[in-house]
Regions:
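A conserved short beta-strand
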Residues: 129-142
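Short beta-strand/loop motif that positions the catalytic acidic residue
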Residues: 156, 161-164, 168
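Acidic catalytic loop of the alpha/beta-hydrolase fold
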Residues: 143, 166-172, 199-200
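Gly/Ala-rich beta-loop-alpha elbow adjacent to hydrolase catalytic centers
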Residues: 111-116, 120
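C-terminal catalytic histidine-bearing segment of alpha/beta-hydrolase fold enzymes
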Residues: 174-215
Length: 215
C-alpha cells in the first residue's frame, strides 16, 4: 500500500473538460463521465453523444499524462495489464473532479474506451455504490487488486456493460477473458461481443449502450 501522505494524484484539468450542456443547463441532469483511450483527448468521445440518451449530460475528460499527440491515463506497460499504482493515481484525480461537480447531478455514470474503459471499471471498484453504472468499450479490468475492493464491489454488484469486438488487435484475448470473468463474478454485467469489430466502437454497440443507460 502507498502511504496516503506521499501518494501521487494526477489531477484533471477542469478548464478543458468538454460538456454537452452549458453551465446553466446542467443542474439536475444525470451525468455521464467519459474517458478516452491512450493517445487521444477529451474531444474524442463527444461524437458518441448523439447516439446516447439526450437526458444525460456528457462530460468528456482529458487524461493527465501527455502521450504522443494526445494523452494517457497511466503508462501503457503490458497491453491489458498495466501496473496498478499509476492507475489508482489517475483514479484519485478523477474522483476529486467528480466530487467537485456531483452535487449538481442526481446520478453519475461512467463510460470509457480502451484505456478509458479500464479507468471506468477501476473507478467503480473505488466506489461501488457511487455510480449508476460503468460502460467499458474495448477495455479491460486492471489486474493485481488484493486490498478488498473486489470483495466490496461483489457485495454491491453494480451495473456494468462490457462491449468488445472479436477482431480487436489491441487488447489481448487473455485480458478480455479476465475482464469477462471478473465482471460476471463481481457485478451485474451485460456482456456483448461484436462480430467483425476491431478496436473500435460500432453503431450496433452504441445502440446497445444507449439501451443499457436508459433515461
Amino acid at each position: 500500500m502507498v502511504d496516503a501522505s506521499t501518494k501521487v494524484v494526477h489531477m484533471i484539468d477542469r478548464d478543458v473538460v468538454q460538456w454537452t450542456r452549458g453551465p446553466s443547463e446542467r443542474s439536475g441532469t444525470p451525468l455521464l463521465v467519459t474517458m478516452h483511450g491512450v493517445g487521444s483527448n477529451e474531444r474524442d468521445l463527444l461524437g458518441l453523444a448523439p447516439a446516447l440518451p439526450s437526458s444525460w449530460t456528457l462530460a468528456s475528460l482529458r487524461a493527465p499524462m501527455p502521450w504522443g499527440q494526445g494523452f494517457s491515463w497511466y503508462p501503457l506497460g503490458t497491453p491489458g495489464s498495466p501496473a496498478l499504482e499509476p492507475v489508482d493515481e489517475s483514479v484519485s484525480g478523477v474522483l476529486d473532479w467528480i466530487d467537485s461537480v456531483a452535487a449538481d447531478h442526481p446520478r453519475i455514470g461512467l463510460l470509457g474506451f480502451s484505456q478509458g474503459g479500464s479507468m471506468a471499471l477501476q473507478l467503480l471498484r473505488a466506489r461501488p455504490s457511487g455510480f449508476a453504472f460503468a460502460v467499458s468499450l474495448s477495455g479491460f479490468v486492471v489486474p493485481g487488486v488484493t486490498d478488498g475492493r473486489d470483495t466490496a464491489i461483489e457485495q454491491v454488484r453494480p451495473r456494468v456493460f462490457l462491449g468488445h469486438g472479436d477482431l480487436d488487435p489491441v487488447i489481448p484475448a487473455e485480458a478480455t477473458a479476465r475482464t469477462q470473468a471478473w465482471a460476471a463474478a463481481h457485478t451485474a454485467v451485460t456482456d456483448r461481443t461484436y462480430e467483425g469489430l476491431p478496436h473500435a466502437v460500432s453503431a450496433a454497440e452504441l445502440a446497445d449502450v444507449a439501451a443499457f443507460i436508459g433515461d
